[in-house]
Amino acid sequence: MERPNLAHVTPDVLEYIEYLEMQLWQKPAKVEPVAAATEPSEPPTSINIISISQSGVAKRTPRHLYGRQHRAGMGVFDLDTPEEDPPAFLVAADITDRLLLFTNFGRVFPISVSQVKETEVRGKGESILTGLRFMNNERLVAVLPGMGGEDVLLASQRGWVRTIRKSFFGAQLIPGMSFHETKEGGELRAACWASGSGDVLMVTRQGKGVRFNQRQIPGRNGCLGTRVDQGDDVVAIAAVTDESGVFMVGNDGKGTIRQMAGVLANKAPGAGAKVLMKVDELVGAAAVKPDQDIFIISRLGKLIRFPAEEIPTKEGVVQGVNCMALRADVAAACTISEFVAESALK
């Protein structure tokens, strides 16, 4: 558009127009964010990414159908659910494996991965809770693949922790079997697989955490793992060592990888938690290796996959870096899985 003839304009108005023109000229152009380009898919794999809503509506999609983006990309639309039933869980598991569904009452229900409806990346799921005898006010709080270690670690909302041997989750597992008493630390909140000989990291919604050795957890009854502040609660538990990194992500899509070398283990469970990440609300935490991929899903059903190595590792407290571009949306859950390059199969 050409500049019109301003000869008839008074000097003071002309001066003001020229001032505005100069401001616009000096102001950098605003670049609208666009979806990050995806890398070619990995070779076909039997590993599936399972997306699950708050009410238990789920779908599975082969992992290789999710293209890799770069950190801070916009992701792709994944699980299609109503606004009132947003995605809440994300898990990677082999098609031949089972899923362990943990409820807030500490009960466990096993189902086969193959039972979950398979769809394209964007798809509507079906309830995986159909036929399961849930009690009043019972709901899903954690989902694990059927295999992943020697023990399962359980954490309650008020910081109680217990360890359960993997043999209890074998073929003889009775659907609905209970492994947690809500009178001990409140309802169940998180679960993870562990090696049986490493350390435990418990993380709260306010980004605080505590680390101690798993062998210090007494028997099946467990103990207080950490003292949780009023208004806070446990959201994740992870099995770690000095060499481990733990990916932590907030609802704003910012995340970090905390190196456990910078988080000293307490001499015993039960200590107060210390700040690990500056965050308004932490939504997930999981142990991660540099050669693995991170998957994050939002409440609007968008999912991003990117290499863990794109996140700077830190030994100190940080606010995190942008992991997922969110517009009127919040991050809901995350999971970690491998990336198999074509060259690895040759």
Q: What label would you give each PLM region?
A:
Residues 1-346:
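Short, structured "edge-of-domain" segments at secondary-structure transitions
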